[in-house]
């Protein structure tokens, strides 16, 4: 009984669901309205141009309220900090800030090495920019600071402008490091200027040109670049400096060539550190629900490796390279070297765009997850100020880290108070504890970097998913990845963006063209090739393109239209013109002979003359022109015969029609262009539409348009598209309106057709 009772409600529910589905299918709606062309629609809806909003007037207003609003807009901390719920959020932000700081310390040291700078400058870059973002940022969860992709981009610039000496024994490390710090800090200032400038002019949409496949392909290639750049620290090798295209290939070849020179102590140190880091990360993933915060594997590895290196003397006994001197305290601000701007402007713009793209993509992910809004333009300003002010204090360009951002969110972080706490912890290390890491092996920092690349290297699996989902996106991913690997990071991004934009143009050149048919008993029209029940309306051809028509695809649109209609329009027009020309020539010849006949009839002799008027009878028969009769003309009755012949010609049907000329006629009398996909029209599109009207009217097919949006109609008017031959009565509110009108008004053969000039 219990089982039966339990199954009863389920059966009842299933029956109700089926009944509701049937009711929904049977539920239809009936609506009666007149056919609406554009003229009637404008009258009915009282259409008028939308009023222009003068946003610039608002921007240029000068008032106390406007100044206060601008202050709150560009300094968001004044908005959210007074409302900060201390009891609910402070504990989570404190724990999150400490967790992020524990990650910031080893990553800052390691990523400075990746940028070709002394490790302490990674700590500076983990303090100043983070605190500046706390004041100006709008994302509550991203962790700003050093990041592998940004660091390797900076490293490629510093190594190209301040390279190693050709003879390693002649290296002046102090002078080299000072030059690289100057290059990196100047680069950071220039990156900040670009980002602030773009943010102030509301240019945050620039990141929309970097699609997700492009960004993921780029970061994956950058991860490969980072991995290769750390091999010299893992194996303890001294490599030559390579920059420019194919530098990655040259570096890999040199590593393979010098692999026998590897230092065993360095390799063992890196391997042990890597194994420890991997094990700790696996434990964190497995015990994520049980642990209040992740095990700080990087910090523990850092402390343990430093202690072992100091106790065992790894530098002297096994020639393991160590970090060396880390000065305590902060450095004074330094003005950027403006003479380097011309050399850095290209790299600075690339780094600015990439850094912003990474930050805004992560920021939007967390904002969507937690239900708040991120202002892309203010994010540009915040990142720009972080890099600008950070560069003055000798930091290198930063962005946000995915791994640290995830930790900041997962450990209870609710606001950028967590970022401020982490920056204060880094400040404590800079001032008091930095010198304790003097004996930290560089191989350990390299291991930390390589292990943290796991997430980005996993993006190689994108190729499989993109192959199944969208092969055009896969092509973007592959081109971006390959170009970045071969041409380096700056040129790789340029090639990727250009290719992505070209692919967009190519895809608009080859949209999906379809002939539409009516779904039975509805006013819905679908592609007859996809919907088996959709049938073409007899006598009417409905054509649609899935993309807007503009200069790049207007010719393709016209060609596809003529092909899908099943009529060789150009051939019919050319044959019609040839036959009409021949007909005119025959008529002219006949008139000339009649004139000659009249002259002979008016001669004084008055003799009866037998004349064959039509000497080209066979020619006229072969061209389907009405046969001319052989006639006997005398001087007495010639004018009466000519009058009779003229009356017969006036009653004859129009000889210019396809039927009269013996040419095949289209099996439809009306063509409807579904223009619902058009978002704009240019002059080339206007000319193409005009030519379509002209060509199809030449073969006795009337053309109508349907489903144009109001902005498109306005652009048609501005382009003087409508005239005496093409009016708004040819434009209908929907495809069904146009089809119904075409069926009610099949185009008759006109006595004097309205001509449309072909453009």
Swiss-Prot record:
The keyword Transferase appears for this protein: yes
> GO CC terms for this protein?
apical plasma membrane; basolateral plasma membrane; brush border membrane; chloride channel complex; cytoplasmic vesicle membrane; cytosol; endoplasmic reticulum; membrane
Chain ranges sitting on the Cytoplasmic side read 1-115, 208-263, 315-347, 401-416, 506-759
- Extracellular membrane side: 137-186, 285-293, 369-379, 438-484
Q: Where is the STAS domain?
A: 530-742
Could you tell me which residues carry Phosphoserine? 616, 752, 755
| GO process terms (BP) | angiotensin-activated signaling pathway; bicarbonate transport; cellular response to cAMP; cellular response to fructose stimulus; cellular response to type II interferon; chloride transmembrane transport; chloride transport; epithelial fluid transport
Subcellular location as annotated? Cell membrane; Apical cell membrane; Cytoplasmic vesicle membrane; Microsome
Instruction: Name the principal localization, coarsely classed.
Output: membrane
Q: Which residues cross the membrane?
A: 116-136, 187-207, 264-284, 294-314, 348-368, 380-400, 417-437, 485-505
Task: Could you list this entry's UniProt keywords, alphabetically sorted.
Answer: Anion exchange, Antiport, Cell membrane, Chloride, Chloride channel, Cytoplasmic vesicle, Endoplasmic reticulum, Glycoprotein, Ion channel, Ion transport, Membrane, Microsome, Phosphoprotein, Transferase, Transmembrane, Transmembrane helix, Transport
Q: Which InterPro entries match?
A: S04_transporter_CS (IPR018045), SLC26A/SulP_dom (IPR011547), SLC26A/SulP_fam (IPR001902), STAS_dom (IPR002645), STAS_dom_sf (IPR036513)
Which PROSITE patterns did the record assign? Answer: SLC26A, STAS
Q: What is the induction comment?
A: Down-regulated by pro-inflammatory cytokine IFN gamma.
Short name of one Pfam family: Sulfate_transp
Distribution of this protein across tissues and organs: Ubiquitous. Highest levels in kidney and pancreas. Lower expression in heart, skeletal muscle, liver and placenta. Also found in lung and brain.
Swiss-Prot/TrEMBL catalytic activity: 2 hydrogencarbonate(in) + chloride(out) = 2 hydrogencarbonate(out) + chloride(in); oxalate(in) + chloride(out) = oxalate(out) + chloride(in); oxalate(in) + formate(out) = oxalate(out) + formate(in); oxalate(in) + sulfate(out) = oxalate(out) + sulfate(in)
Modification after translation: Glycosylation at Asn-167 and Asn-172 positively regulates its chloride oxalate exchanger activity.
Q: Which GO terms describe its molecular function?
A: bicarbonate transmembrane transporter activity; chloride channel activity; chloride transmembrane transporter activity; chloride:bicarbonate antiporter activity; efflux transmembrane transporter activity; formate transmembrane transporter activity; identical protein binding; oxalate transmembrane transporter activity
Statement: the UniProt record of this protein carries the keyword rRNA-binding: no
Gene3D superfamilies, per the entry: STAS domain
Impact noted for substituting residue 167 to Q:
Reduced chloride oxalate exchanger activity
What modulates its activity?
A: Oxalate transport activity is inhibited by 4,4'-diisothiocyanatostilbene-2,2'-disulfonic acid (DIDS).
Chain segments carrying region Disordered: 636-657
Q: What does this protein do?
A: Apical membrane anion-exchanger with wide epithelial distribution that plays a role as a component of the pH buffering system for maintaining acid-base homeostasis. Acts as a versatile DIDS-sensitive inorganic and organic anion transporter that mediates the uptake of monovalent anions like chloride, bicarbonate, formate and hydroxyl ion and divalent anions like sulfate and oxalate. Functions in multiple exchange modes involving pairs of these anions, which include chloride-bicarbonate, chloride-oxalate, oxalate-formate, oxalate-sulfate and chloride-formate exchange.
Q: What is this protein called?
A: Solute carrier family 26 member 6
